[in-house]
Amino acid sequence: MARKTPIERYRNIGVMAHIDAGKTTTTERILFYTGVSHKLGEVHDGAATMDWMEQEQERGITITSAATTCFWKGMDHNYPDHRINIIDTPGHVDFTIEVERSLRVLDGACTVFCAVGGVQPQTETVWRQANKYKVPRLAFVNKMDRAGANFMRVYEQIQSRLKAHPVPIQLPIGAEDKFEGVVDLIKMKAIHWDDASQGMRFEERDIPANMVEDAKSWREKMVESAAEANEELMNKYLEEGDLSPADIKQGLRIRTLANEIVPMLCGSAFKNKGVQAMLDAVLDYLPSPADIEAIDGEKESGEHAERHASDEEPFAGLAFKIATDPYVGQLIFFRVYSGVVTSGDTVYNPIKGRKERIGRLLQMHANQREEIKEVRAGDIAAAVGLKEAVTGDTLCDPADVITLERMVFPEPVIHVAVEPKTKLDQEKMGIALNRLAQEDPSFRVRTDEESGQTIISGMGELHLEIIVDRMKREFGVEANVGAPQVAYREAIRKSVDVEGKFIKQSGGRGQYGHVWIKMEQNEAGKGFEFIDAIKGGTVPREYIPAVQKGLEETLPNGVLAGFPVVDVKVTLFDGSYHDVDSNENAFKMAASIAFKDGMRKANPVLLEPMMSVEVETPADFMGNVVGDLSSRRGMIQGMDDLPGLKVVRAEVPLAEMFGYATSLRSATQGRATYTMEFKHYAEAPKNVAEAIISKK
């Protein structure tokens, strides 16, 4: 089957935003204008097409990134048909893992900003993640019709807070309830969308007289930005003093793809204004798979390899999401980076070392599906029938194996114990939790060896609430949830050299393991590092992996209160062995003995997770909020002003934040909101550490 849409006309994009910037409504409008959904879904009444899990509809927040395919020919039908795959990303801070994993497989993004709230905490997090994956993006300033809307303030915040270079290609005509449309700075025309057709039709008019000067000066800035793309455009601009619309678009495209600028547009998705022009900007400025650098990976031999976005290359894809569908079972969403895959093909998963057969291939529109026969380079689809694959796994041609770069997922910071309400549901709960952990790599399940309880861990209270909620809805298991527990860690603060001996030689086959190790503090976040510095074979080569294993098996249980040990560098530098009695187990035990002894001597400390907290509160309650955060051992990092609101930024230990939502509501009559995300681990003060250790 030949390719229907040339790869240059593909756009794989995400819509990213802070929780209330209007991301879901914006995505809904995209689906409406591209002709996929005929009734506009509104988040306000819980009917949005993309939010297809029930809880999302209740809470009005987007949780799972669904991938949807749609087509666009331009607002004026003046482009050839383009195929846009939209990966819906959540805007709630407990779900940053979902955002991270969708960013991994998209080529460009539309960041939605609220014209009133501007750059909010979650926007900064998502922006940092997009920088990490070098994703080119557009900025869409939404909610221009709301009281307090201010396009220029958002422009300044993108510069000051996100350290980005926004280039407005539109200006709003009016604001708040007077918002009528936009000035297109490339055409120098005013665009008004027609309310009766829900924005399907529009007309171009002259720019309002009171805006002409402003529009000229912003156009000048935009043309200068475009001219800086290359010498040819710069020379044209210097000679002629202007650039043609095609040249402006070319220059802005080059610079957007290089992540030098962010084209900036505006509108009100809810009022059906502006999203249509944003779709045109997706075609004009965001990359096709062919514009993206080849993806890196490695061959089985460990050599570096890469794949280009071409049908001619061997098949390689990345599984980025697992979802359970009530009708077809487990779906694996994957992005094809190179080659072609057909339903019925056998693919190889190098991470699991297994071949698997792809049953059916589906393309999704939110949660409706269309069966397809094949999927080609640059496209996104869902496969049925893959039993082994999980998020982050590579799928490739068995005849040409490549492993694409793995995704790195953060460690959970909060634990709770769960037990089924009825003993009969114990097994059912185990199945449900394992299925949910497969779908979400930032959620973990384990059984506590001492108490026998089931412990679930995640990125925040909301994250775990939703897991418990899904268990009830999707698997019919009701659970009781214990009080949340903080994921403390242990570390060392001084370097020590220690000896570990495991010797049993009383007749018969004995045991003999003997090591000297140096333990020192590693850089924060570096984790455990093992260095083999044995000279002259004092510990034979074949026992060195056993030493490392002995150390790694001791890490989960520190000496202070049994918490995992992090950020420690261990160098094996000496030891001895016995020709007959030495074996792997003896060296493993010797390493473990040395490590425990070293921990006690190396000034062990307790680390606690610190959270970055932002509170938006009416100015009258500012004192209460700051006082409350300080009483929770919070360090105030700074304050900002928003219209009628104060924003307090603080760093607070997670242990002090439980139940914060309730106390914030009562301290501010329910008028303040907050967001919280994990920042880093920090040493717990002595009195706090002693209290935790004494409880163990």
Curated annotation (Swiss-Prot):
One of its GO terms (molecular function) is translation elongation factor activity. Its main location: cytoplasm. Disulfide bonds: none annotated. Gene3D superfamilies: 3.30.230.10, 3.30.70.240, Elongation Factor G (Translational Gtpase), domain 3, P-loop containing nucleotide triphosphate hydrolases, Translation factors. Residues 8-290 form the tr-type G domain. GTP binds at residues 17-24, 88-92, 142-145. It is found in: Cytoplasm. InterPro entries: EFG_II, EFG_III, EFG_III/V, EFG_IV, EFG_V, EFG_V-like, EFTu-like_2, G_TR_CS. GO terms for cellular component: cytoplasm. GO terms for biological process: ribosome disassembly. Keywords: Cytoplasm, Elongation factor, GTP-binding, Nucleotide-binding, Protein biosynthesis. HAMAP family: EF_G_EF_2_B. Belongs to the TRAFAC class translation factor GTPase superfamily. Classic translation factor GTPase family. EF-G/EF-2 subfamily. Catalyzes the GTP-dependent ribosomal translocation step during translation elongation. During this step, the ribosome changes from the pre-translocational (PRE) to the post-translocational (POST) state as the newly formed A-site-bound peptidyl-tRNA and P-site-bound deacylated tRNA move to the P and E sites, respectively. Catalyzes the coordinated movement of the two tRNA molecules, the mRNA and conformational changes in the ribosome. This is Elongation factor G. It comes from Nitrosospira multiformis (strain ATCC 25196 / NCIMB 11849 / C 71).
